[in-house]
């Protein structure tokens, strides 16, 4: 519908960006209690300096999962938007305790591969299952195959269980608006959900 005479205002992006600026500028995360706390604060400072883009995506798409990982002796936090994270289960407090992280497609020869990483927290046991899928067409999950079909996934275990865990090892964040599209769902919606046609 857009042409030389009719141009979109771009309000959805502007709204998401404005909310992200407010959230990230007022965000404070701190730990105290010695050398370990100092290390945590150092890692969190790096995360906070880059978090605005992630929050902007969260506001636009309706959700974001944050998952920490270790690399080179430092802790990094992977931000996964609603396009690549599927919440599967919520506890009585509406906290996401199970979900699936979908990797970016990897092309090997003429085939595309994606890795689905299932995370589940049940009764103090945290389970991670890794599965690989392949398709000849990009964007299609396809059929399940062995993880080893992709060289960089070959060393990843198919399943890991961690016991005596108090909470999920990821966080699921949604915009502070009610889901007016599916009122029975715990999933988040865009900050401008329900008004998309009026805003474009």
Language-model segments: residues:
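Extended, helix-rich architectural segments
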Residues: 1-91, 95-96, 107
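Structured, contiguous alpha/beta core segments that scaffold functional sites
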Residues: 56-63, 67-200
């Amino acid at each position: 519908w857009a042409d030389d005479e009719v141009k979109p205002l771009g309000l959805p992006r502007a709204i998401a960006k404005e909310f992200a600026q407010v959230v990230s500028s007022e965000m404070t995360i701190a730990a105290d209690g010695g050398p370990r706390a100092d290390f945590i604060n150092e890692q969190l400072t790096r995360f906070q300096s880059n978090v605005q883009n992630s929050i902007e995506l969260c506001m636009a798409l309706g959700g974001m999962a944050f998952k920490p990982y270790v690399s080179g002796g430092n802790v990094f936090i992977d931000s996964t938007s609603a396009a690549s994270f599927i919440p599967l289960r919520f506890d009585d407090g509406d906290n996401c305790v199970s979900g699936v992280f979908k990797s970016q497609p990897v092309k090997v020869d003429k085939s595309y591969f994606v890795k689905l990483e299932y995370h589940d927290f049940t009764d103090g046991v945290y389970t991670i299952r890794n599965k690989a899928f392949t398709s000849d067409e990009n964007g299609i999950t396809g059929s399940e195959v062995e993880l080893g079909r992709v060289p960089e996934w070959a060393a990843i275990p198919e399943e890991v269980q961690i016991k005596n865990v108090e909470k999920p090892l990821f966080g699921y964040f949604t915009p502070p608006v009610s889901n007016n599209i599916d009122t029975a769902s715990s999933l988040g919606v865009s900050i401008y959900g329900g008004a998309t046609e009026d805003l474009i």
